[in-house]
Amino acid sequence: MSSKSQQPPTGLSKSAAKKRAKKAAKQSQNPQPQSAPQTSSQTPASVPPLPPASVPDPLDPAFFNFPGPGSYPIDVQYDDTAYYDQVDVPLNQGDFPGSYSIDYNLSLQNGSQLAGLSAPFNITHDDLISAANELYKRMADPEFGSDDAYWSSLPPHIRQFIRDAVPFTGSISQSTPGTTSSQRTMYQMAQQIVQAASQGMGLGHGMSANLMPGINANARSFPSPQQTIGEEFGFHRHPDTREEEYDDEEEIEEDQGHPAANGDAPKKKNKKKKKKGANAASLSAPVEPPAPLPPLPPPSTLSKIPRAPAPVPQPQLPTHQPQPLSQQPPSLNPLPPPAPASAPTPTPPSSRAAGKQPMGTNPPANPPARSARAAGKAPASAAPPHNAHAGHSHNHPSTAKPAPKGKSPATAPPAKIWTQSSAEDRENIRVFWLGLSEAERRDLLRIEKDAVLKKMKEQHRHSCGCAVCGRKKVNIEMELDQLYEQYYDELRSYAAEQRVAANGLRPPPSGAGPFPGSVEVDASGTVTQYDHRAPELHDHDPDDLDGEESEEYDDDDDYADDDELDDDDIGTDEADVGDEIDEPPPPPPITHRQQPRRPPVKAPPRSEGGDDFLSFGSNLATIKGGILTIADDMLKNDGTKFLEMMEQLAIRRSVREEQNLRDMQEETDEEEEEEDDDESRDEPMTEKERAEEGKRMFQIFAARMFEQRVLQAYRERVAKQREEQLLRELEEEEDSKRAKEEKKAKEAQKKKDKKKAQKQKAEEERLAREAALEEEKRQAKLRKEEAERERMRRQDEERVRREAVKRAAQEEAQRQALERKRRQQEEKEREEEAAKKKREREEKAKKEREARENELKEKERKEREIKAAKEKAEKERIAKETLEKAERDRLAKEAKEKAEKIRQERLEASRMEKVRKEEAARKEREAVEQAKIIAAQQAQRERAAKAEKNTADKAAAERISAARVIPVAATAPVLATLGLKSPSKGSTPQSAPPVPQLSPVKGAARPITNATPGRSMQKTPTAYYPQPVPPVGVASFSRMPLAQSFGPPGLRPAYPTGSPAYSPPRANGSSISPNPPSRGFTDPSPPGFDHNLRTAPIGVGFPPVKPSGRIPSMADDAFSPTAPIGVPVTRSVSSAGEMGSLISGSVTPDDYRPTPPAPIAPPNLGPIGRPSFSDGQTSGPNVLRSTSPPPPDRVLGSAALGADDEIVQPQQRRPTTSWDMPTAAPGSGRWSASPSIWGSGDPTPAPSWGAPGSMPTVAERPGPPPGLSLSPGAGVNVLGQRQPSFGGIGSSFGGVGAVGSVIGGGMGGTAGSGLVQGHVGGGGYSQGLFSPQHQQQQQLQLQLQLQQQQQQQ
């Protein structure tokens, strides 16, 4: 312990002095290694060398020396341009006798002219992250004290600073604005402190915005509980502050507890401790520190600002807490600032404080930027040493302190993250200051005073202008002037002492230097050396340490180091880093903190301004903490706090005498006051001591400000010297460079002259060589020109020769071309002659053919006219009989018709549903078959076209001759096969090639319910395509409509007159027949016809259903679907006996069985509107008696056409002679299955030989077998050709032989020789053909047919 001065320390109570003496004694007995070297007393052994001459900028910040921790914090953070740009600093122009040292690793802050000039001037990310790491580790310690009394003890400007710094969002108490209710609020506060520190350290908004993105997501929810809120706001613990130690278990248990839910600290009974004689020794032993435990979880709400205990190591956190920042990779970007929160309403100041404030009580919307010391209090990773006391030149060893119960062991606070000046800088400033003259020193101090006064006046501009405030301003200026005068005297005396010490006559003056009031603070804010006025420690009675019994602080108490001093002895937790330790006691004690109570001192009556800024007797440490902060703010052009300090100094000046008098009257014995511990206060200082302490505080402020001023002057001097040195070096370098250039120029000139001579010689040699070369080139050119002329002459001769040869070749080619053209012309003329003769022959043959055809057509027309007249008369008669019959039958069948109609409608509905379902399947099958048929038809058409072209002329003659020579007897077998007799007059049908049919148009089939019971009639769709032209010469009787009443009911024609079955050929889709088809009515099949006699047309491989009774020879071949398509069937009808057997009825239902299908089409694929043939429908009697509707597979009309069916145009059929089967166009049976020569208006097959009751509609009737026309008027017919109806079964016109007389004469059904199925005469009226249900339909049909016939005629 230093013993420079034996005088009692000023500004300290006896209890504090005793405590310090006791600590010093224990530290001297237990020396420990120093945590950091003490550099303030070091003197440079030798003058450091000057910086290198290569520094180009006279303002290069490299010579601003700010080394690491352990030195005084001279921060270059103020605005030089605004602070020092108005006054010229008088510098000593003479030689600088002192030595100085320059550090080239300077780190500057924003706001300085030198900031940003070099990369080393910015702090690293690692430093900032380390500071933030320590900050977050200290955030959530629940043991930090928080009480209103402590907050109230703070000066108004400190409280206002905290309010402006952190806008809290939690619940705010009346006197504590910094309370928060959640860890998130604490996290935001830490972020703001980091941001402020980053801005103060020169990082700017960009870097401080994202300081800690590397923190994992849980860091927000679980911050590290190692940083105090007070330290976050820029208030550090006093360097001598340590956690209190307990001497007995009773006090340890007494002080334990947690803050209550409402924010109040746990109440602890304030017991008056008595002296314990016997137990003092046992309680003096130090308590062993417990194992590190995780901090107890803080309550949900903490309404007070936690006080900052000694830094403790981070405890073992639970597994869910985030990893410490020190273990995480550093982030490249600073932490983003938290969302702005609404600032709480500040505590309204007292009337006295409000009168001293120049502005309103509301905090400014944008508070002034905090200094680096005030805003960036986040500790860094380096632990600072706390090993020096005021006035001590030695270091105290750091000893381990037993951690109190319920708390984690303490660790040294980390170092500050910005750089500070070192002892070498301080020595350089001292040497520079001593080297200045008296006038220069006075000028520097005057400049400093004027600058401070100017700042203060600028602050006064915004203050009140009343007389009271005016007097206050005058007092402040007077006080400031007097203080600076006193400080100048101190500077002069301190400089004299330093000069004497420099000569070695006496030791150097106490204090950190180089000026009176200077203190040295390391990077973490720990005071390492104090000012020269700092009081020394002396031994005192240990009983007076704490105002309690002497046993409380025994000699065996374990004080770790300087930080063991109680916070309440020397200041608050939020004391700034530059606080001195030799300060008076704080305000009245806080009974519920975790610190021991202060010794009871009777507080004297406070003056009116007793709680002001300079209440040195009770709150000096806090004020001195603010002194360095005020100085830093002044350096940053913020003089608000300085103005407050000066206002309070002026107030203190006015009440000083009164206070001195009051203090003298209230002095009592100090020992008695210490024993009276009810109030727990220290003895206040006297007014003189307070004045001295105030002067000391101002010296600290002025020294910090003046250090910057002198440092600026020193830097300017160094910069000027460096600039001069640099200019000299540059000049020398220029001279050297100029000399070298002159030397180089001379040498270059010599080289140029030598090279010039060499070039001239080389040029002469080159000219000689060029002259020789030029002559040689001229000779070569002459030779070349002569050779060129010779070559041109030879080329001309060759060109003339080639042209002559070419002309000869061209003449020969022209002659050959003319000869070839002549031959081609002759050949063309011969071909044209031959073609002309051929055309003449063809035209002649065509005219003859047309003449014959016209003759046949004329004959046929006449026959049709005769037939039409007869048919008309017959229809009238039949219509009359029909009406009479219908009237008789209508009444009898009306009841039956209704019942049958209802049943039939149900059956028809079910059948149509089934038809629709099977229609889709049939369409698919037909599409496949249609593709096959189209391919076969294409091949067939090609073969037919070739055969027709070659035999066109021959076929015409053969057809004429064949039609003339056919005997009548030859037609008998055919008629016998059909159950007919040949007509009395044999007709001579002539086979003519039918006109090619156009593609049919799909017609929609519209079903019409017929009145016939048990039968649902449907409208027959009309197909619009031409039919084959009848042979020339064959009489056409279709003009005479065949009335339905001309025959017996069993022999009715299958097609009504006027139906498409009787239609003549149509030209371009229009009907030219006298009886166009009726589009709404169809006839049922005659009862006497076999319903099962169904055949497929030519080209479709359907197996025909053979009729009852065996028809040999031609019938088999004609009905066999296995016969090749287009191959004529040459077998003729063998005899008429077999036809007779058909008529006789001696046949069996199963004699005529279907043969296997042809390979072209499957058996189940038929033309549109035709039912499929199956064996199940060929049984005779059962089918005849069946009254059920037709099977659902009979798709009617165009409904059978699929969307992908191709409309095939049948080709012209190949003519045949005699009984040969003509070649049918493939698919013609599909579209022209009508039994009439004129074709049907719809693709409806021929009527079946059905039994009574099974009367399918026209659309359901099957077609004839291949090669046979089973029309009602089946006259003489060549197999495979459609012929007009010349009478026949059931007609009124006579056929061949006696068949026409028998059948044509008797319509009543008594002579039934024309029936195919059943008995002769088995038809008749008994079959119900003309039943009443047909009457209305037949009447309308007959009327329409008659009208059409009349219109066409």
UniProtKB/Swiss-Prot annotation:
* Name of this chain's protein: Stress response protein NST1
Report residue spans for region: Disordered: 1-66, 216-422, 503-522, 531-618, 652-694, 727-882, 979-1119, 1140-1276, 1308-1337
- Coiled-coil regions in this chain? 713-944
Name the residue ranges with Pro residues bias. Answer: 46-59, 287-300, 331-349, 1154-1165
Mark out the compositionally biased spans (Low complexity): 26-45, 317-330, 368-388
Any single Pfam family the record assigns to this protein: NST1
Q: Which GO terms describe its cellular component?
A: cytoplasm; myosin filament; myosin II complex
- Where found, per UniProt? Cytoplasm
Q: Which organism is it from?
A: Cryptococcus neoformans var. neoformans serotype D (strain B-3501A)
